[in-house]
Swiss-Prot record:
Originating gene: valS
Species the sequence originates in: Bordetella parapertussis (strain 12822 / ATCC BAA-587 / NCTC 13253)
Family according to the record: Belongs to the class-I aminoacyl-tRNA synthetase family. ValS type 1 subfamily.
Motif residue range(s): 'KMSKS' region: 569-573
Annotated compartments: Cytoplasm
Record text about domains: ValRS has two distinct active sites: one for aminoacylation and one for editing. The misactivated threonine is translocated from the active site to the editing site.
Protein name: Valine--tRNA ligase
Function recorded in the entry: Catalyzes the attachment of valine to tRNA(Val). As ValRS can inadvertently accommodate and process structurally similar amino acids such as threonine, to avoid such errors, it has a 'posttransfer' editing activity that hydrolyzes mischarged Thr-tRNA(Val) in a tRNA-dependent manner.
NCBIfam families noted in UniProt: PRK05729.1, valS
Motif ('HIGH' region): 61-71
Length: 960
């Protein structure tokens, strides 16, 4: 694709600068791409066929957040795929967006208000929400600006914010429809409650942490006086009451029963009897339920239905009263004894334990390790709390009027993976997805926050609820129901993940039946970390399929999490986070220390974090540029594994960018100003070899993208550019340009520029900035761009392997030449010859091959001359055997040292021969191994045997 336009960001008359400076290139080219509309949907390489849609949705980052290493990794993968498919000719759509991030954003703004000694309650809801919008406008563009720094070729006119009017409309429509279908309901349920934020918290946002606690053993006296039981040893024992063990003695104030196992013979005769609830003026019954473990403790537990999830289910089964004894901020309420009312939960624990001991109800206290649930946002210990909440029914069959009648939204989501409409990469994540959906509970979607999508439900004065798209519609429903008077809107907001789950279809205009919705749903692939498979991936599948009948995406590529070099999770509290922009632009040590120690939840950690930072980064972090960071991320992208990020890898890929830059300068110096059009010219075996290797690279890159093996893509590009093109072909090309005929020089110059141009297109999805800058110069010489025309590598056809260009003969010839060069270099190394010391080489073997290779050997092995002879002279000079050739350096040698070297080589060859004979003498190997493998082993044996014969001959010539 070429655009005629006057503005060209490259000075075509200016030579390529001596060094690669990424900062200037990156800013210039990103703005230019966006201005030209290359990122827009419908913009693609013309292939002559109807372009297929290729769609990726951003996992929307928090609007108030900043870029972290996970974003950098995720964006590299997504943008690499989008750029690749754009160059393939697909109609690419890369949809950017940000999430309003209810809890996270509200916490940030509340902290700002706290610093001013103002609470959100002082402001009131309306003013507080205005403050949040102000904060969003101030900071919301930060993360999208950082995403642009990474080169994300997103369709920015489609950018959304999950609280935008169009997105909010889709949220309300989904809620109303699900409610009308009986799949959203309101009920009093036990939920995880954050007493600091005063909101319900998703089960998935609970972090369980092992802590050292205590187990309190408490006596509950029988109302009827002591009772006799037969213990597990058959002894008759008289009990004053039942003893239970608990880690939370303060919750006993809300006990509704004691419970034993129905088959426990010790207590069967006690079922239905009453016990006194210590410290409280009431009695509770002894009941039986299968969930009790008769072998744990005394085999008796207390049932506190309103403050324990297991107890809640048991209480419902047995109609035990649910007594709430905590206020929403975790203080004892009016349902507790007066002496404890108003106490904070941990103060209440101390007071309850002291009173139990004083009244001789406390039997004993033991140390006990326990799992403590904490909110992942605040770190506060969560409280099971019985509250009115809104839920999505996950297992209820959908009614006849829906797209999947008779099936629950969970069932439909499971089927989509089972029948292959959605595929996970790697496959094992499908098992995790299935396990979670098969054990799912109804989803609590209400949050007691002020920032978010307010639930579209209104209440009349007598408590009737009207769920509607607007207050006007709710009023109409109320009038139709004969309800007069004002309506009050539900103050709660929706779980952030509810609106995020609608992104696959609301971003394309749903609930309207838009052309975009029909064309771009489903997305091609979702790229995500495994940590949000449950939060986001499964919920997108459920809601997209229920509301539209389509899967949200065809593939789910699940990548690992970025950790530090020691494998530790990156977190602000550990002080081991890295800001990707700091890797792009660089940061000095003092700036890095300030960044890592600012705003810590625990300021006492600052000293240790500063010390560690100064030790790890004594010189700060150098500027690597975006391309080096992207190449690093791609090279790390193995399927599903966590990534231990090492800064040295960035340094290595920055060196790669420098290598590519310098190689391009060399190629341009040797090709600019030469007429390279047409098909004339003579291709050497080296020219044909590098073109043949290019076909293998193109095939490997295509496989890598298809299999989501970005590490293979990156490694293949690295090996070809560094090892084959730069280290070998450029050196061979120098010889051909200096010593070849005009036809050979033309063939070499053409090969140099054409292969480089193809490499720049191949590498563009991974390293877009440097490839664009270099391609502008290279394409002019390669005939891919005309002077003055505006074009971009980003919309050039992606190279595809051509089997006709594979040349096995040329590959074998260069492999032989490489072996000879390396053999002579090894001889030079063993002789401690300096690079400046050029010595003659005498070569015995196939005359045509050695004569052809002679000029290359002389240049690459730093030889003064190469003489091809029928037989090597009898001289005490070092010799290397390479296939059918014997190569002698014509220098004075230390005979003893050369004998030792040959003895070592003889021992190595004898070892290889013994191994090969062992394999071929093993009947099992010969019978079971593929025929090609057996033949390969025979060929190896023959080669080693022939080489050993020649080396022994050389050893004999040298004598003792």
């Amino acid at each position: 694709m070429t655009d005629a336009a006057p503005n060209q960001p490259v000075n075509e008359s200016q030579k390529l600068s001596k060094s690669f400076e990424p900062a200037e290139i990156e800013t210039r080219w990103y703005d230019e791409w966006a201005k030209r509309g290359y990122f827009d949907a419908g913009r693609h390489v013309e292939t002559g066929t109807d372009p297929q849609p290729y769609v990726i949705q951003f996992p929307p980052p928090n609007v108030t957040g900043t870029l972290h290493m996970g974003h950098a990794f995720n964006q590299t993968i997504m943008d690499g795929l989008v750029r690749y498919h754009r160059m393939l000719g697909d109609d690419t759509v890369f949809v950017p967006g940000t999430d309003h991030a209810g809890i996270a954003t509200q916490i940030v703004v509340e902290r700002q208000l706290d610093a001013q000694k103002v609470s959100r309650h002082d402001l009131g809801r309306e003013k507080f929400v205005e403050k949040v919008w102000e904060w969003k406008e101030q900071s919301g563009s930060t993360i999208t600006g950082q995403v642009r720094r990474l080169g994300a070729s997103a369709d920015w006119p489609r950018e959304y914010f999950t609280m935008d009017a169009r997105m909010s409309r889709g949220v309300a429509e989904t809620f109303v429809r699900l409610y009308q279908q009986g799949l959203i309901y309101r009920g009093k349920r036990l939920v995880n409650w954050d007493p600091k934020l005063l909101t319900a918290v998703s089960d998935l946002e609970v972090q369980s942490e092992e802590v050292d606690g205590h187990m309190w053993h408490i006596l509950y006296p029988f109302v009827d006086g002591p009772q006799t039981i037969t213990d597990q040893d058959g002894n008759t024992v008289t009990l004053r009451g039942m003893t239970i063990a608990t880690t939370r003695p303060e919750t006993m104030l809300a006990d509704g029963a004691l419970c034993v196992h129905p088959d426990d013979p010790r207590y069967k005769h006690l079922l239905g009897k009453l016990v006194e609830l210590p410290l409280c003026d009431r009695n509770i019954p002894i009941i039986a339920d299968d969930f009790v473990d008769p072998d744990f403790g005394t085999g008796c537990v207390k049932i506190t239905g309103a403050h324990d999830f297991n107890d809640y289910a048991c209480a419902l089964r047995h109609d035990i009263p649910l007594i709430v004894i905590f206020t929403l901020d975790a203080h004892i309420n009016e349902n507790g004894p007066k002496q404890f009312q108003g106490l904070e939960r941990y103060e209440a624990r101390q007071a309850v334990v002291a009173e139990l001991q004083a009244q001789q109800y406390l039997v004993k206290v033991e140390p006990h390790k326990m799992m403590q649930p904490k909110g992942d946002r605040t770190g506060v210990v969560l409280e099971p709390m019985l509250t009115d909440q809104w839920f999505v029914a996950m297992s209820k069959p959908a009614p006849a009027s829906t797209l999947n009648p008779g099936k629950s939204i969970t069932e439909v989501a499971l089927e989509a993976v089972a029948d292959g409409r959605i595929a996970f990469y790697p496959e094992n994540w499908a098992t995790i997805y299935n396990q979670w959906l098969n054990n799912i509970q109804d989803w609590c979607i209400s949050r007691q926050l002020w920032w978010g999508h307010q639930i579209p439900a209104w209440y009349s004065e007598d408590g009737q609820v009207f769920v509607a798209r607007s207050e006007q519609e709710a009023q109409e429903q109320a009038r139709a129901a004969g309800v007069a008077g004002p309506l009050t809107r539900d103050p709660d907001v929706l779980d952030t993940w509810f609106s995020s789950a609608l992104v696959p279809f609301t971003t394309f205009g749903w609930p309207e039946d838009t052309p975009d919705l029909r064309r771009y749903l489903p997305s091609s692939v979702l790229v995500t970390g495994f940590d949000i498979i449950f939060f986001w991936v499964a919920r997108m599948v459920m809601l997209t399929m229920h509301m539209t009948g389509s899967v949200p995406f065809k593939h789910v590529y699940v990548h690992g999490l970025i950790r530090d070099a020691d494998g530790q999770k990156m977190s602000k509290s550990k002080g081991n986070t890295l800001d990707p922009v700091d890797l792009i632009d660089g940061i000095d040590l003092e700036g890095l220390v300030r960044k890592r120690t600012f705003g810590l939840m625990n300021p006492k950690q600052a000293g240790a974090i500063e010390k560690a930072t100064r030790r790890q980064y004594p010189d700060g972090i150098p500027a690597f540029g975006t391309d080096a960071l992207r190449f690093t991320m791609a090279a790390y992208a193995t399927l599903g594994r966590n990534i231990n990020f090492d800064l040295k890898r960035c340094e290595g890929y920055r060196n790669f960018c420098n290598k590519l830059w310098n190689a391009t300068r060399f190629v341009l110096m040797n090709t600019e100003g030469h007429a390279l059009d047409g098909d004339g010219g003579e291709l050497s075996f080296a020219d044909r070899w590098i073109v043949s290797q290019l076909q293998a690279l193109e095939a490997e890159v295509e496989r890598g993208f298809a299999d989501y093996r970005f590490d293979n893509v990156a490694n293949a590009l690295y090996r070809y550019v560094w090892d084959e093109y730069c280290d070998w072909y450029l050196e061979l090309a120098k010889v051909q340009i200096q010593q070849g005929t005009p036809a050979q020089q033309l063939g070499t110059r053409r090969t140099l520029i054409r292969v480089l141009e193809a490499v720049l297109r191949l590498a563009h999805p991974v390293i877009p900035f440097i490839t664009e800058e270099l391609w502008q110069k290279v394409a002019l010489v390669a005939g891919k761009r005309t002077a003055g025309a505006v074009a971009s590598v980003s919309v050039q056809p992606y190279p595809r392997a051509n089997p006709q260009a594979v040349d096995a003969e040329a590959e074998a010839a260069v492999a032989e030449l490489k072996s000879q060069v390396e053999a002579v270099r090894a001889l030079r190394g063993e002789m401690n010859l300096s690079p400046a010391q050029r010595v003659p080489l005498v070569a015995e073997g196939p005359t045509d091959v050695l004569s052809r290779n002679a000029p290359y050997l002389a240049a690459l092995a730093k030889l003064s001359e190469v003489e091809v002879v029928a037989a090597l002279p009898d001289a005490g000079a070092p010799v290397q055997v390479v296939g059918d050739a014997r190569l002698m350096l014509h220098v004075e040698i230390d005979v003893a040292a050369e004998c030792a070297r040959l003895d070592k080589e003889i021992a190595r060859l004898e070892g290889e021969i013994a191994k090969a004979n062992g394999k071929l003498g093993n009947a099992s190997f010969v019978e079971r191994a593929p025929a090609a493998v057996v033949e390969q082993e025979k060929a190896r044996l023959a080669q080693f045997s022939e080489t050993l014969k020649k080396v022994r001959g050389q050893r004999v010539k040298l004598g003792a």
